[in-house]
Amino acid sequence: GSGKTTLIESFLKEIQSDVVVAQINPPQVSAIDFLQAILVQFGFSPFKMKKGEIIATLNNFLIEQYAAGRKVLLIVDEAQNLSQRVLEEIRMLSGVETTKEKVLRIILAGQPELNVKLDAPELVQLTQRVRLRFHLTALSRAETRGYIEHRLEVAGAADRQIFTEDTFPLIFRFTGGVPRLVNTLCDTA
């Protein structure tokens, strides 16, 4: 509802051509399913591989991409749904490196519960590798109006008065500035 998936989609449109991306939106999956999903995103068919083969293939792929001058990015949306075992696999992947640098960048996007999971003592090693945490907040009253006006413009309705002046504060009041709720309310209006 806060716009994190939309933000990821916008980010992916702007990404440089030398970046190889795997985007995962897992339901609750096992560690091996998660690793297989990553390899599938990179063009492999890992379904008959054992876990050791999957990890070796993934590590080799990461090193090959680095040697070819490409960066590798793993984006995991709805990461709050990941089990502790999967988060531990992510920690292990984040440690793959050459003598110069780490070869995998990882973005974990999720609901606020993700922060609670990452703060668990069992995941201290993963948390120590987190370079940045960012929290999307709800829109302000002015941002909500700007957001609605922008969406109307994109929809081709910029010249039409869809909402009266006194409607914008009401939309903000009933939605709290949460983009998904703003969209839902405006779509049903």
Residue spans of the language-model regions?
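P-loop NTPase Walker A phosphate-binding motif
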Residues: G1-V19, Q28
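Conserved NTP-binding/hydrolysis module of P-loop NTPases
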Residues: D18-V20, V29-K48
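Central P-loop NTPase core of STAND/AAA+ ATPases
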Residues: G43-Y66
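Helix-loop-helix "sensor" segment of P-loop NTPases
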Residues: F44, E64-A67, L73, T98, ...
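Switch/connector loops and helix/strand junctions flanking conserved nucleotide-binding motifs
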Residues: T5, A31-D33, Q84, L114-L118, ...
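Conserved Walker B catalytic segment
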Residues: N59-I63, A67-L108, A120-P121
